């Protein structure tokens, strides 16, 4: 898509640095990445393009889906085509972000490529409909899915405006978006709820609970605390978390603790300090959980 640079000249560059000129143009591009740098900015968007907004420096604020959301580094916001939202930034120093705009043609090409990959379809069954997918709109952590991890890999090169094969970059972003979308759809289908809108809102809250676990799994995490973060009752949280993710919150905490334990034990930390750091009641309970998970005591794991 043709854009106007700061001097008013047209450009077809796939990565464009923009600031105040964003006030004057509609934000419904196709297959372009906008690197924004703004201090005092507000804009109402009445018809957006399909976009992935990646936080970089500072905080961007949006009024979207009848609520205010904040976007920071380590997060991205997914917005479907033809949506409305408001964006506002007030900061003494520039706030920077990257926005990936993807065309319907690109999404279709990526979906066609995935449909020819039998192995990938076994892991991420594609829907049979030819309709453009409606992606789940929310703030995602970049460490929670394939798309986020790929965006984080791209960030340094984008920030430095390095020369990249942008045709491949756009195709890879679209492919990761679709695989992440299909995984999300699988998880949402597990939730026992008739209405799609209710299921989506429940899934958003469950993702909040899961991220709370990721941020606090080394602490003495209580179910009441987790339910409060997700705005759900304890029993509703327990039931729907297992339906969506195939694991209970307690099992999720234990998995994360033991995964980190393998690294700490391998680095030579004492078993008592590992148990203490990861929130186990004592060395004995840590050793028992480790052996049950990996089939050997942590001391043998270290020796191996």
Which residues make up each language-model segment?
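Residue-level signal for well-ordered alpha-helical positions
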Residues: 90, 113-114, 180, 264, ...
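A short, N-terminal "cap"/entry segment at the start of jelly-roll beta-barrel domains
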Residues: 1-28, 157
């Amino acid at each position: 898509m043709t854009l106007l640079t700061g001097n008013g000249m047209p450009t077809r560059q796939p990565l464009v640095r923009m600031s105040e000129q964003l006030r004057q143009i509609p934000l419904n591009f196709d297959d372009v990445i906008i690197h924004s740098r703004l201090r005092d900015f507000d804009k109402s968007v009445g018809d957006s393009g399909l976009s992935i907004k990646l936080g970089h420096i500072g905080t961007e604020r949006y009024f979207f889906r009848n609520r205010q959301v904040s976007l920071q580094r380590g997060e991205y916001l997914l917005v479907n085509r033809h949506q409305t939202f408001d964006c506002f930034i007030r900061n003494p120093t520039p706030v920077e972000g990257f926005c990936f705009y993807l065309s319907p043609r690109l999404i279709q090409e990526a979906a066609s490529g995935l449909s020819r990959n039998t192995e990938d379809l076994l892991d991420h069954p594609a829907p049979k409909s030819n309709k453009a997918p409606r992606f789940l709109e929310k703030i995602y952590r970049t460490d929670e899915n394939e798309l986020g991890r790929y965006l984080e890999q791209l960030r340094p090169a984008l920030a430095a405006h390095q020369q990249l094969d942008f045709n491949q970059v756009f195709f890879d972003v679209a492919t990761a978006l679709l695989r992440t979308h299909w995984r999300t759809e699988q998880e949402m289908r597990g939730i026992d709820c008739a209405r799609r809108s209710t299921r989506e809102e429940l899934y958003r809250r469950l993702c909040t609970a899961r991220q709370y676990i990721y941020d606090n799994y080394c602490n003495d995490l209580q179910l009441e605390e987790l339910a409060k973060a997700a705005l759900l009752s304890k029993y509703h949280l327990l039931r729907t978390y297992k339906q969506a993710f195939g694991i209970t919150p307690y099992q999720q905490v234990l998995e994360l603790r033991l995964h980190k334990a393998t690294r700490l034990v391998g680095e030579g930390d004492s078993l008592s300090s590992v148990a203490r750091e990861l929130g186990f009641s004592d060395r004995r309970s840590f050793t028992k959980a480790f052996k049950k998970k990996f089939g050997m005591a942590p001391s043998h794991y270290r020796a191996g």
